[in-house]
Amino acid sequence: MEVAGAQAGILPLLLRHPASLRGSLSLSCGGARRSWAAAAATAEGGGGEEGRGYERVPMDTPGAYRLVDRATGRSVIVWGGTDDVSMPSPAVLSTTTRVPDRPKENGRSTSIGNFGRLKAQKVKVLARRSAHLKREDSGRISTSRFSESPSDESDEDGTYFERDRARNTRQNSRSRDDKTRGAHSLNSVLRQYRGADDLDFPGSEATSGSKRWGNISDVTFGRQNQRQKGPLDSGFFSRRSFKEIGCSDEILGALRSFGFPRPSHIQAMAYRPVLEGKSCIIGDQSGSGKTLAYLCPVVQNLRKEEVEGLHRSSPRNPRVVVLTPTAELASQVLNNCRSISKSGVPFRSMVATGGFRQKTQLESLDQELDVLIATPGRFLYLLQEGFVQLNNLRCVVLDEVDILYGEESFEQVLHQLITVAPLTTQYLFVTATLPLDIYNKVVETFPDCELIMGPGVHRTSSRLEEILVDCSGDDNEEKNPETAFSNKKSALVKIIEESPVRKTIIFCNKIETCRKVENALRRVDRKASQIKVLPFHAALDQQQRIANIKEFLNKQTADSMFLVCTDRASRGIDFANVNHVVLFDYPRDPSEYVRRVGRTARGASGNGKAFVFAVGKQVSLARRVMERNIKGHPLHDVPCV
């Protein structure tokens, strides 16, 4: 803004226009106090511009002009109001503000303090106005996509969605009851929270004008805007390069062909200890890259031994054994091995699980072998029958170790393995969740294990939106498993109809419930023209399960696919680009909750939503779990590193 009176050495004075601020200040300028009342009287008594004692000089700033005293040349800038408002009145111009006498510094007047206060007031007014305009702009944007759900609708339609009141972390000191609002009906939420973040499918209701869901973080436990800053906010990738963590040129070339710019946090943390042959417990959240965190350094050691002539591949004598809880996870690890091998790091790998022809697997064992991937039962059979020797064994990997320890026969398998394996064998325990009882069992048997815990262990992804759906029903409704299933089914159908996405995983606790959900979904689309229902549980033979998994992971399909499964699908399987996860039945323990919702929002940039159906006491339990997730707290205590 132009400085008035600069040539005369006069301090510029900024005043609110009298049209908007009555009682403006008249301050001394440059140490000489002079009232503008005489000038104003001259202006009112004079006829026309020529007879005035001062004149108004327009400025470029709208609503501002410079008031110049013709007699002395002194001027003041007046800002505010409109350009065509009349001159300040004599009463305004002659008003003075009494200030306490202050000691002078070097003989100069301290009237600058008045100007300072006026300037501070002006800045505060501008700040308030700016904040108000921002709130109005954000309100216009938000109300165009979100509308506040009326409280009376939730009473009419029944309670379905829990609204999170703890979005602002300043409210953390409030009680738990104060952190959540009243529930909203599924109907009202589906009716009001619409947007374009879900996919459109040819021939689906979404393309024919049906309502769709948008970003509904106002009524969800999504952490994109709510989670407190923590280690997870530093991003998926580590700041270190693959070269810095110890990758060989061969492995580095393979990783570059995969398109990875840098290692993930757990890969950067675990690579060097694994490469040095240390036994380790490796833990981080689902989708963090744990498979490559152990596989790449292990394969690098195999290649180093071959180059140095220390060891070579031999039939029925693997140098690495990987045990997994399910055949599907074993197949996934095998695919990773083959991808590395095809990218310029040659080694031989095979899988041995139940459900396949035993003759084919035995024939594969007769060939040269480096890495054997197996389920515990099949591995124990091959070991006891003499089809596998462990003379050359260098490393044992127990993937999803917490699940393995939950199997009755696993400790027998582990004992047999320890008895036969060489004393120098390296053991790697890999998991997304490590309850303290499992940790204690591991360190009791392997006290020298190095503990490597990534930033996301026992935590869900920060890009996951968790939505609590209360399926308890009305208070006067009879409470039994049948009514609970009916309420859940109604909620699921509404989600399918109102929020069409490409891939959804539905978790149930029992095979019987899976079948009931499958039938309900098929009745929604009797012609099977818009949705594809794929079951995945132990009642199916292994070939059918693998076929369904492959179809679900197919990127070319235009169908909206639903994988209806038990916890078998949550055990380490890497599902890419899953949009929604539905917990139709609430999981039995927090670890299973983490594994289930971890099937979406995976990797460096994955996003997804988890719909958690709960009834009765499960509602408060789910709310507490989600509140911990919002704050970034682990669902289990993390073992001390």
From Swiss-Prot:
Keyword Hydrolase recorded: yes
Top-level taxonomic group: Eukaryota
Matches recorded under InterPro entries: DEAD/DEAH_box_helicase_dom, Helicase_ATP-bd, Helicase_C-like, P-loop_NTPase, RNA_helicase_DEAD_Q_motif
List of residues binding ATP: D284, Q285, S286, G287, S288, G289, K290, T291
Helicase ATP-binding domain mapped to chain residues: 271-452
PANTHER family (UniProt xref): DEAD-BOX ATP-DEPENDENT RNA HELICASE 50
Domains (record comment): The Q motif is unique to and characteristic of the DEAD box family of RNA helicases and controls ATP binding and hydrolysis.
Protein name, entry field: DEAD-box ATP-dependent RNA helicase 50
Organism expressing this protein natively: Oryza sativa subsp. japonica (Rice)
